[in-house]
A protein has these predicted regions:
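Intrinsically disordered, low-complexity terminal tails/loops enriched in metal-binding residues
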Residues: 8-134
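Sec-dependent signal peptide recognition
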Residues: 1-7
């Protein structure tokens, strides 16, 4: 019951789940031959509050993902994203590296494991679909 309530509240208020207003940001989830990235940028280059909140959120998820903790995406989307079971199982073969960008930040995800790569790509495709990323 409590988990259902928390998920409902998170879905109604995604800014609290992620720490920033999604209407003031743009998400990108590019895939590469060895992984991909989660990129979030403030739409207004002068919006320091959004840039700061984006960076804090992405630093947190880079740390959490490296430990196999995908609770933030669960809270944000109300379901576990595609690929997460494999990302958890193969966490020792995946690297998550946070980087600042001019208008926000990025989590670079890399692996040389073919099964982990499939999981990373499944996760990024799910995120792109959910965030209506272009």
């Amino acid at each position: 019951m409590l988990i259902t309530l928390l998920l409902t509240l998170a879905l109604q208020h995604p800014a609290q789940a992620m720490g920033f207003d999604q209407d003031k940001t743009v998400h990108h989830f590019p895939m590469t031959a060895n992984g991909g990235s989660v990129e979030v940028n403030a739409t207004d280059a002068s919006d320091e509050a959004s840039r700061s909140a984006i960076r804090m959120h992405l630093k947190h998820i880079a740390d959490a993902f490296a430990k196999g903790d995908f609770s933030k995406p669960l809270l944000t989307h109300g379901e576990m994203p595609d690929g997460v079971a494999e990302l958890k199982r193969l966490k020792s073969s995946i690297r998550y590296k946070y980087e600042d960008t001019a208008q926000g930040g990025a989590v670079r995800i890399t692996t040389s494991d073919p099964d982990a790569l499939k999981a990373v790509h499944a996760f990024l495709k799910y995120q792109a679909r959910e965030h209506h990323a272009k």
